[in-house]
């Protein structure tokens, strides 16, 4: 869609909003339209504020920077991240693992993506591989609130027998 808009010189810009990808159209008269690309609906500032408060925090505020244009890499990463979450939700762990590996191509040392890959490996019963990734996350992000849960999972995995695949 963005490629077609670019070829037709349409002022359609991708925006990585905190809750999802949205599209921004800047009209020649200065008016800005925001569109939900999943259903084509026009989005008001009120709707974006509701999304923030419902998905992020009741005290979250909408800032103009939330509507900044995203570059192609950001869009691809967001789409892959959304795909990975959907695949994990659907228990399609092999595909989720491939998606996680693709995301790691952008930033191979991202502790959060390495954590996610470790969680996927654990779901695939590849605990010995999961241990490395989960331990890396805890080492890199000891203050992250989820680190304590990951430590418990590491302890649980460490006490299991290793199954060779």
Language-model region placement:
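A structural boundary/capping signal
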Residues: 2-165
